Amino acid sequence: QVSVVEMSDQVMTPVDYEIATVVHQHFKSKGVGLHLQEAVTAFRPVEDGIDVVLKSGLVLQVDMVLLSIGVRPDVKLAREAGLEIGETGGIKVNEFLQTSHSDIYAVGDAIEFPNPVSGRPSLAFLAGPANKQGRICADNVVNGNHQKYRGSISTAIAKVFDLTVGATGLSAKMLDRLQIPYKEAIVHGASHAGYYPGA
């Protein structure tokens, strides 16, 4: 038995609520206990495991706890080097991935870069953009600044048991908050080409 405790009204906050509700139902169909809009107030070691006390007063008796409570860029070294840290807490870089010190470049989860949709500073904790940044950065360091990084719209895909969930762009919640008009499309299709085994 697995239980998921989430402070938000949905799991996978980067996806729109309509997609998250499909994930919620899939969790339940697999026997996962889902506790939304809940918070953990205490962990109590007991003889045969751990009691997880929730804000509502519910106590979950578990063998193991896995904490996944967000991501923050590790910018300690950048601060010590005197590099500029942006409003999101990431290392501020220009289009060539240079930091505030022109001889120091930065890439990956630790950088802040304008989101191509909103124009606002953002972080992208994804392997795809980090890989692209690394290639652009290496080219710029070796050959001079001629490759520009244009940002990431944060396309992400996750496997939830046998369900594939993906999203691209900003969520409806974020676009509403930023007052950016948008159109959305929700597609329930195959996760890979039909001629592959298991399609």
Explain the meaning of each model-derived region.
Residues 31, 88, 101, 179-181:
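A generic structural signal for alpha->beta connector loops
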Residues 38, 95, 108, 186-188:
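Residues at the C-termini of beta-strands that transition into short coil/loop
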Residues 2-93:
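A Rossmann-like FAD-binding core segment of flavoenzymes
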Residues 45-50, 101, 197-199:
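A short, glycine/Asx- and small/polar-enriched loop/turn
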Residues 33-35, 105, 183-185:
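General small-molecule cofactor/ligand-binding pocket signal
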Residues 110-199:
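Mid-to-C-terminal Rossmann-like scaffold of FAD/NAD(P)H-dependent oxidoreductases
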Residues 51, 59-139:
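FAD-site-proximal beta/loop scaffold in flavoenzymes
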